[in-house]
Amino acid sequence: MICHAEAEDLPAILELQYLAYRTEAELLGNWDIPPLKQKLSEVEEEFRTGVFLKLISENDGDAIVGSVRAVEKDGAVQIGKLMVHPQFRRRGYGRMLLSAIEAEFAGKRCVLFTSTRSVNNIRLYESAGYRIFETRTISPELKFVYMEKQL
C-alpha cells in the first residue's frame, strides 16, 4: 500500500535509502554518493518542504519497502529518491511509486535525474513518459541525465 509518510517514518526511510542506494554506488564504483551520506536532520528538512510517500508491505509487518519524495521548486516538481528495497524490486513497485507521486502534482512539469549508467532507471522513466532534456558531466566517470514530463 502506498500512502503519505509521517515524520516518525523518516528514520526507517533513511535506513531504506542507505540500503537501496548501495546498488547505485556499486554501479558507479563510488560509495561517496549523497544518498549514502545524507543525515536524518537533512531528511527531516526535506520532509518539511516536500511530499514523501511510502510503500508498506502488509505481509511483512507493515515494513517500509519503498519510498519517493518530491518538492515544487523553480516552477517544476523535482522528484527524487525513488527507491525500493532490493528484495522487493522487479515487481512494479518503482512504477507504482512514480505514478503515485505524479498524482500529487497533476498538471505540473516534473523533473528528475539519474546517472547515465543507471540504464534500468532510464528505461523506467522513459516508459513512464519522461524524456531527456539535458545531460550534465559531473566528472569524467560520472554523467547525469535530466528528464522531464508534463503531467
Where are these regions (language model features)?
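Conserved GNAT acetyl-CoA-binding A-motif
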Residues: L98, E104-R117
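Conserved beta-strand in the GNAT
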Residues: K54, D62-V71, Q78-M83
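Conserved beta-strand-loop-alpha-helix junction that forms the acyl-donor binding cleft
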Residues: R89, V111-I122, I138-L142
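A short beta-loop-alpha structural element at the N-terminal edge
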Residues: M1-E15
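Conserved acetyl-CoA binding element of GNAT-fold acetyltransferases
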Residues: G75-P86, F113, V145
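Conserved acetyl-CoA pyrophosphate-binding loop and the N-cap/start of the following alpha-helix
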Residues: F88, G92-A100
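Conserved GNAT-fold acetyl-CoA-binding loop/helix
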Residues: L14-V43
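A short helix-loop-beta-strand connector motif used in the catalytic cores of GNAT acetyltransferases and
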Residues: S41-K54
